[in-house]
Amino acid sequence: MNNLTDLEKKINSELGTKINSTKIQHNQIYVEIDKEDLIDVTLFVKTNKDTKFRQLIDITVVDYPEQSQRFKLVYLFLSHEFNQRMILSYNISENEVISSLTSIFPSANWREREVFDMYGVSFKDHPDLRR
């Protein structure tokens, strides 16, 4: 999909109930989900012929200490085929355990370890979660 508007429509139509919101800003698509939908959404955007987000560029956290869901997990994906970036995010409370993406993107290994080390966010099924 060469057009971000078409990409947004595709993601919303295919993943409707798993998507909380989408927007196009700064020539990127921003997608907000619930943590329970991370694996399904990630598999779709990586493997679907119209999305092809086959590179995980980064995983980071934004800390909002005044909010009950203190942490926002942010994943940055790149589609080389379509030259597009997608920012996928969701909020969690302190001490929640979330799914690891290492089985889908092996490069998530180090990035998830860094998030664990810096923010204490634990990843379920991570092969080597240590500081």
Where are these regions (language model features)?
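Terminal low-complexity/charged segments
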Residues: 1-131
